[in-house]
Regions:
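Bacterial N-terminal signal peptides
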Residues: 8-19
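Primary mode marks residue(s) on the alpha4-beta5-alpha5 output face of response regulator receiver
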Residues: 27-172
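Bacterial N-terminal signal peptides that target proteins for export
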Residues: 1-9
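Bacterial Sec-dependent signal peptides at the C-terminal "C-region" and cleavage site
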Residues: 18-30
């Protein structure tokens, strides 16, 4: 809330200096990260990822292709990993993990996760072009670099944020 208040004050000062009144629309739009702020190249790559993973809205398809339940993470959802895809490469069209939420009438695909073992590289691997996205280091179990993308459920924290406030914080 503090950053939003500071932001609101800055907007008001700018509006006074520019001679216009602040509006609710401009304040709330600026307070939310938007996909539109990503580069054209990044948006193109996200479209490739969506096209490649759209088939996994049908969970049976993901199951048939080797994605298996790993765990539930509050704010991330139910994570299914295809272990045959875990290697030393970042492949936009073949995410190592899929994130689902259970809406009571089946699973809903909400995002993907790219995974590169730390044994492959001591520094974060390359990711989406033209972004300042930081891979997350996870040391539990197999030490990995992880990069999440909220492809199918908008995340007000940002496309590549670790957690999505729209995803339940409690696991079943």
């Amino acid at each position: 809330m503090k950053s939003f208040s500071t932001f609101s004050i800055l907007i008001a000062i700018c509006c006074v200096l520019l001679g216009s009144a602040p509006t609710t629309r401009s304040t709330s739009a600026a307070a939310k990260p938007a996909v539109e702020n990503l580069s054209a190249v990044t948006n193109h790559e996200l479209a490739l990822a969506r096209n490649a993973t759209a088939k996994y809205h049908d969970f049976d398809r993901a199951d048939d292709e080797g994605y298996e339940f790993l765990h539930c993470v509050p704010g991330e959802g139910l994570e299914y990993v295809n272990w045959s895809l875990v290697d030393c490469t970042f492949d936009i069209e073949h995410p190592e993990a899929l994130h689902y939420i259970d809406e009571g009438n089946g699973l809903r695909l909400v995002g993907v996760e790219y995974v590169v073992p730390v044994a492959c590289t001591a520094t974060p691997p390359e990711g989406f072009t033209g972004t300042d996205v930081e891979w997350e280091f996870e040391a539990e179990g197999l030490p990995i670099w992880a990069l999440r993308a909220a492809l199918w459920l908008p995340n007000r924290e940002g496309m590549f944020a670790e957690h999505n406030p729209s995803i339940p914080t409690q696991c079943p």
